[in-house]
């Protein structure tokens, strides 16, 4: 599993408001994101908190927020699915995509993925190496996340370029990933500037 913290979101640069990116995050989640304490919040609340917290002390040409994406391999997705099946196995039931799970299993699967999100964000907070400033875990960082289980082909995919798939179609198989938006400023007393870019491709 790899984390790729985007310096600049494809949905707009991160020098200004996070609204456009956060609305993109909420498009398939009923407009709800989970926060650093395990609660669900609206898209409006999320981007307003990020924007308000990120004001002041940052130059106009510097990032105010970041958008890490945690992407899982198909084998990792199948492993998580095998942990939550209510009956049978992924092999006996021929589980190959998220849509092969029943409603209860989909809920349990997403819960497991959210648990991993908190683990990954805890590790990121530790890797800032600012424990002396009060940054110890994910609760010391202002962030919001959403789990997505589908990916679409884009014009940049080789399958589209080679005319083996159409742009906009769903990709087959498990495609679970976690979108995160997080403030450049931590939640410690000094609101220290933090950046995941030092570990732009860190294996977790």
Enumerate the language-model features and the residues they cover:
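N-terminal nicking endonuclease/strand-transfer module with a His-rich metal-binding environment
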Residues: 1-204
